[in-house]
């Protein structure tokens, strides 16, 4: 089970976008995540007529390491650490360590 999943709201804890909040768009296998409108770079792209892509300079989201993001706790209004626990029915769920609230209902 992963600490950060697709669709989670996260806060960036390090780097040029420190303190910004966004939603995880994609989780990569090498412990990196792509966060919406975070770590934007300008990419020079050639036109590709077969795929219908125009050329030019485009803004693109680049992945950041999972250690540089924290899951956003809406009850506290800030980032929080995540742990795992097993419920009585045998399900393994994520929870916020500061207030023991379950993330996955």
UniProtKB/Swiss-Prot annotation:
Pfam families: KOW, ribosomal_L24. InterPro entries: KOW (IPR005824), Rib_uL2_dom2 (IPR014722), Ribosomal_uL24 (IPR003256), Ribosomal_uL24_KOW (IPR041988), Translation_prot_SH3-like_sf (IPR008991). The gene is rplX. GO terms for biological process: translation. The lineage of its organism: Bacteria, Pseudomonadati, Pseudomonadota, Gammaproteobacteria, Chromatiales. PANTHER family: MITOCHONDRIAL RIBOSOMAL PROTEIN L24. It comes from Thioalkalivibrio sulfidiphilus (strain HL-EbGR7). Keywords: Ribonucleoprotein, Ribosomal protein, RNA-binding, rRNA-binding. One of two assembly initiator proteins, it binds directly to the 5'-end of the 23S rRNA, where it nucleates assembly of the 50S subunit. This is Large ribosomal subunit protein uL24. Belongs to the universal ribosomal protein uL24 family.
